[in-house]
Amino acid sequence: MSDDARRILMAILLLGVAGIIAELLLLGHDEDFYQWIPIALAFATMLVSAIVVMRPAAGSIRLFQAVMILMIVSGAVGIYLHFEVNMEFQLEMDPALSGMNLYRKAILAKTPPALAPGAMTQLGLIGLAYTFRHPALLPRVAG
């Protein structure tokens, strides 16, 4: 991968993470411990990204990859949690709902948006793409 492509991926990652931080803080996504997890991970991503850009060594790249995996996992867990809350709310509103009707109402609910945490997963994947065949991870050829 070219250095330019790697820089573009990092820029996309940082813009996306900055957007997520702003959105979560503006929406008040800070009511309990679990709601702080994506905010903390987003800030960790910013910090580790700065380290990787300034000191691209194997150790910093591996740390960056670990944070990106946590971003991916947090997105999947967030989708589950948002969906779960939406299902509970829909059942409170209409206990007769079940099957596809319940699923449809829960997945399309506006608050919390069930698929919004998927942005964390997408950004984690972009971060992992940044590390693909990173020069700091390639074996050194003696010669």
Give residue spans per PLM region:
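Alpha-helical membrane-associated segments of multi-pass integral membrane proteins
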Residues: 94-137
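Transmembrane alpha-helix entry/boundary detector in multi-pass membrane proteins
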Residues: 2-7, 24-45
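C-terminal TM-helix exit segments that contain a strictly Trp-centered aromatic cap at the helix terminus
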Residues: 70-92
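Interfacial segments of alpha-helical transmembrane regions
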Residues: 6-11, 58-73
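Core segments of alpha-helical transmembrane spans in multipass integral membrane proteins
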Residues: 14-16, 36-50, 69, 73-76
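Membrane-helix interface and helix-disruption motif detector
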Residues: 27-36, 86, 108-116
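Cytosolic juxtamembrane helix and N-cap/initiation of the first transmembrane helix
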Residues: 1-14, 133
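Canonical alpha-helical transmembrane segments
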Residues: 43-64
